[in-house]
Amino acid sequence: MWPLQILAAAAAAAAVAAASRPAAVLSPVTRTGSTLLVDGKPWKAVGPNVYWLGLDENVVPPEGEPYDPVTKSSYPAKGRITDVLATVRALGGTMIRSHTLGISLGNPLSVMPVPGVVNDAAFASIDWAVYQAGQYGIRLMIPLIDNFIGLLPWGKYTFLRWAGFNLTQGADATNPEIQQFYTNATIVAAFNDYIAKILTHQNPYTNQTYAEDPTIFAYETGNELLGPVWGDMDCPADWVADIARVVKRLAPQKLFVDGTYGVNKTHLAIDEVDVFSNHYYPVDTAKLQADLDLVEGAGKAWVGPDANGTKNMTAFFDIMEKSTVAVGDAFWSLFGRNLPDCGSFVDHSDGFTLQYGNPANSEYTNHRIQLIRKHFLAMGQGTQIAPDDDLPVVPCPAPAL
């Protein structure tokens, strides 16, 4: 593992070199009722989940580069980041939802490896991703915590462990004590402090804090938050309101997304929440329509930030495109080439990996990608194309803008 001082110095030097390239300036995204606006015109947030932009556990880097063998984590190569941004542009996407741009804790390579300690070197890949996203005109939606721990790790169990609760996802997912994450004053204060450290970090490429940079259009409480019973949506309204106020105080121009796993009716009246969401495994058109009806009644917006499936895909897209409440959606999840090797693609173990342009893709997979692109262009740009429209070629390496 490299000394943190060397990593931080290398990141600073790269940022100085990039400073000669003017940063793109995107307009903020605002909300009026159930409509998102950019410069007064309706805007839709369509794109993929690309969780690994800040930290990844799928690639072993070259010898000598930062790597944690316990969690198999490393920082993604800059070329991988620009490659996936160019891919999102080719897909017609307008945004990316990326977990590790906001969830980075409890791991030796993370922003907060231990309580209260900030690892500045971990911001290097995050800074680059945010900067390049702005240059590519791709906005970002960023969750702040995860209901699960994962391999990296990154979940609420990290804060529980730091506060002295010996709880693990494997053994304690149904233990009522996990609700301490939402109710324990010490944990809530620690999480609020963590949020502040993320949002007030200044990106050397843009000279803006994450709170200021309009490339990040929304922060989300977290990913698939719930309580000890699967599907209970037991993410207390008081906690959601508290986190929303923290984000709005630090970043008043950001939209705030309720990341509860499902649309919780008790949250609909929270003034600071702009957007509600749900995840759909498998794709469920009846559930989708019920969620849209709930959110419409509250005069808020809805985004489907996580969905994957094959059945009813076209019907699912059709409902969202016709809805006056749906402001976007994202599929799980996009991986690209393993730069600097343009001839190989990065794999992930969950069975939902989508690789644009992989020669090994089946005809079925490529047609699914075509349907996603058709949907993104229709919903995000109002452009209609044929379901079998040729997929644009993404050059490799994609340029750093």
Annotated model-derived regions:
Residues I372-L401:
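Catalytic domains of carbohydrate-active enzymes that cleave complex glycans
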Residues L26-V275, H279-Q289, D293, G297-A301, ...:
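Active-site mouth of glycoside hydrolases
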Residues A8, N361, F376-M379:
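Short linear/disordered segments characteristic of secreted peptide precursors
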Residues M1-S20:
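Fungal secretory targeting signals
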Residues A19-S27:
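Cleaved targeting-peptide boundary
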